[in-house]
């Protein structure tokens, strides 16, 4: 049975995406974002609760610069191909390690963000969301919380040493357990718990296709491991699947 036939038979599809998916939209990876004045800081000095407690202004400013890059980015053809694929299968879940919201911007319906979203903010004390209007009106950097004295706005992302959002982790685990077909796209397959999701899918009998420019620890386990850019590979794959479906439905 070909992989296209397995995809056609799949009742549920899981798509796991990492930094490589966003890099093609011009969003620098976490490491690449440390350019210019930021190159002298380690990630631990910019993306930990301790760093924020020590120098909230510096951390907020770094994230402001990263937000600018995210706001000017657009989904690429690979994001749009996943939206098209969603219309061709009964159930498709995107689980992403990216914090840029590009899957939602492209039109994906079911997206779980394991590491949060850089365009959202929340109070660092109450964890309640803070709206963009409040942030825009604030003269402070970071803006003060509207909820509690001493509270500050912080990016709604997962910093080093923090726990991942429970709802997203549980939804991702459930999607991995129930899927018949899993894609791992643009991820190094090193960061947990995301790295284990394709292995959970395999254990439950799913087919696994990896799309990444370089080999990863996941590559030996994949039914098919494709070296290439997510945008190009996904467009080809989805159009081939569409053609296969038309031919076999005829």
Regions found by a protein language model. Give the residues of each.
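Conserved catalytic core of sirtuin-type NAD+-dependent deacylases
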Residues: 1-250
């Amino acid at each position: 049975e070909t992989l296209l036939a397995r995809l056609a038979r799949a009742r549920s599809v899981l798509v796991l995406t990492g930094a490589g998916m966003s890099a093609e939209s011009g969003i620098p990876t976490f490491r690449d974002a440390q350019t210019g004045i930021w190159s002298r800081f380690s990630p631990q000095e910019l993306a930990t609760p301790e760093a924020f407690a020590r120098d909230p202004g510096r951390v907020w400013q770094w994230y402001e610069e990263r937000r600018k890059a995210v706001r000017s980015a657009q989904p690429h053809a690979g994001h749009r191909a996943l939206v098209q694929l969603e219309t061709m299968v009964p159930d498709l879940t995107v689980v992403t390690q990216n914090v840029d919201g590009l899957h939602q911007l492209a039109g994906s319906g079911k997206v779980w963000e394991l590491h949060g979203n850089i365009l959202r903010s929340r109070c660092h004390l109450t964890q309640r969301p803070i709206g963009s209007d409040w942030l825009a009106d604030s003269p402070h950097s970071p803006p003060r919380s509207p909820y509690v004295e001493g509270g500050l706005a912080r990016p709604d992302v997962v910093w080093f040493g923090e726990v991942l959002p429970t709802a997203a982790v549980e939804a991702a685990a459930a999607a991995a357990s129930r899927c018949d077909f899993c894609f791992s796209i643009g991820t190094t397959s090193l960061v947990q718990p995301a790295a284990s999701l394709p292995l959970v899918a395999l254990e439950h009998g799913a087919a696994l296709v990896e799309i990444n420019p370089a080999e990863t620890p996941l590559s030996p386990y994949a039914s098919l491991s494709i070296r290439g850019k997510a945008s190009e590979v996904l467009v080809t794959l989805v159009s081939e699947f569409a053609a296969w479906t038309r031919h076999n439905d005829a």
